């Protein structure tokens, strides 16, 4: 592939990301889940967005100093919280932070969360993941009309355009009392030495 051809493709990809992010609209302010202290936000993208652009856009956001990433769902309780907070229709056709690395056994091997959390919980719609189609499916999406229990993940090709994505903001650790006390003691010691 020539440098000019590669540069043109890179420019198109960059332009696609910029336009997708520019067209992104938050449905509401980030919502906090008291169980883990994380915040969640559903982002709609006019004209749709591919998985890689959604991942990049999520990573450029922050809320109260916490960096964002595509949502990782680690339990049925967290899944129910998302459905209760945003509704099944609000999550429908939005990217998760779930992907299948190249070379994984198909259709259900190697699924990985973007933040490295263990993939011990899944919420696949019955019959999913199925790696349908000739191009394969390697990214997770909320789909199939989420039911009350949050059932409804599907695997899609990461290059397909979907309605948006869900961002999760991890909690920013607050200083513990012991750290505050130690810092105060250190400050007092340094002041007395002068």
Where are each of the predicted segments found?
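Small-residue packing motifs within transmembrane alpha-helices
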Residues: 12-20, 178-183
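Short alpha-helical segments used as structural interaction elements across diverse proteins
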Residues: 5, 9, 52, 189-191
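Bacterial N-terminal signal peptides that target proteins for export
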Residues: 2-14, 175-176
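Extracellular, disulfide-bonded carbohydrate-recognition/adhesion ectodomains
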Residues: 27-171
